[in-house]
Amino acid sequence: MAGKMSIVLFVLLVVFLTQNQVSRANIMRDEQQQQQRNNQLYGVSEGRLHPQDCQPKCTYRCSKTSYKKPCMFFCQKCCAKCLCVPAGTYGNKQSCPCYNNWKTKRGGPKCP
């Protein structure tokens, strides 16, 4: 009788420890996914800008266009991802590859 009780307790202990390990692995995976989402939110660290620097850079970048609202919207979206905005009001995208290579579904440039 005592032998059976020991085996049952041992099996319960093994099941408990296994569930504990699985739970820890799931928590670590969730934390890693959250960290990846946070990195996507603040850029790929390609550029040197801080997220708060995007507004003034995009304001200058879009200063000469007649489509200011869409230009600012996409410029800020691109800056948040790439953490850089090319110099000047047009062109110079080679200085910011992430900004240059982000395309729309149709294959056109996403960033102004």
From Swiss-Prot:
Pfam families: GASA. It comes from the Eukaryota. Keywords: Disulfide bond, Secreted, Signal. All shoot organs. Belongs to the GASA family. The gene is GAST1. Induction: By gibberellins. Inhibited by abscisic acid (ABA). It comes from Solanum lycopersicum (Tomato). Six disulfide bonds may be present. This is Protein GAST1. GO terms for cellular component: extracellular region.
